[in-house]
Amino acid sequence: MSRCKFRSLNYSEFLNLVEKSDFEEVVTREHEKIMAQKVDGTFNESMKLENRKLNRYLDMLCFDHTRVTLPAEKNRGDYINANYVDGYEYKKKFICTQAPLQQTAYDFWRTVWMHHTRIIVMMCKKKENRKQCFAYWNDIEGGDIVFGKFKITTTQIETHLSYIETTLLVTDGTSAIQEVTHFVFTQWPDYGVPNDVMNLLNFILTVKSAQKDVIRQLAQERFKIGDNPPPIVVHCSAGVGRTGAYCLLDSAISEFDACATISIPSTLINIRNQRYYCIFILPQYFFCYRVMERYVNLTVNKVSKKLIANVATALFNKVLHLKDN
């Protein structure tokens, strides 16, 4: 099957699309084409007998070519069900992974530590439909939890309408210490979509703002490990649906801010080439369009108001100048 190609849309083309009467039909066909497109990749490490127990779901495997490889330790392999995923601004902006299991929590923190990660985004609740995300951090302020050499201390918790922001201090038994901000979005049900577009949009913009703060702080510290900022670790339950949607929307917002274009289908194809099976549920794909529709409208309105204000100021100054003369 030939590979699908989709062109970028400018803001007016995008808004015309989402306002069309056959929008759902058009996007359904688009999603079907993306799902049918063959993705090249192998899953040899995921399918090894010793690694199968480290996968939360037997059918949610991890590409070999983009997988995170952990440093080997005694009685510990290098495998974790996690993949690097590019963002719009730079490569390997994200590490997309499954919710930690009891037997993988230590590997999760090894991943965070080795990449100097400063932000974790959790797109699921601790408990959903009787499924439990293993408690890999302590949700009591002042509490701590230990996994192997890592001690994770909770120093601050802020509860908001649709998310929880927690500050964690991570140590590895040496004098080194790493501060991590842990964001949990609480309004996205498994296999469903949030009830409110703005809740998710505000959450994504909040995390993007936090990442900008991290980049500024690292610049002040003259951080020199790698060419790019530390990756953001993103997970839900399987690490493909809500996780994929988060990465798609983050990238789409960055693209629109930089170029005033929107490339939702091609962005999803790029993500799926790096993390297997992302956004395979159609309603989640629709919802990404609705979030971007809101963001584009808000941005265009803000720009329009600014232009109107600038024109009004220019006219006012011109009138004053004429009066003075």
From Swiss-Prot:
Belongs to the protein-tyrosine phosphatase family. It comes from Microplitis demolitor bracovirus (isolate Webb) (MdBV). The keyword Hydrolase applies. SUPFAM superfamilies: (Phosphotyrosine protein) phosphatases II. The gene is H2. Gene3D superfamilies: Protein tyrosine phosphatase superfamily. InterPro entries: Prot-tyrosine_phosphatase-like, Protein-Tyr_Phosphatase, PTP_cat, Tyr_Pase_AS, Tyr_Pase_cat, Tyr_Pase_dom. It holds the Pfam family Y_phosphatase. It catalyses: O-phospho-L-tyrosyl-[protein] + H2O = L-tyrosyl-[protein] + phosphate. Its EC number is 3.1.3.48. This is Tyrosine phosphatase H2. GO terms for molecular function: protein tyrosine phosphatase activity. PROSITE patterns: TYR_PHOSPHATASE_1 (PS00383), TYR_PHOSPHATASE_2 (PS50056), TYR_PHOSPHATASE_PTP (PS50055).
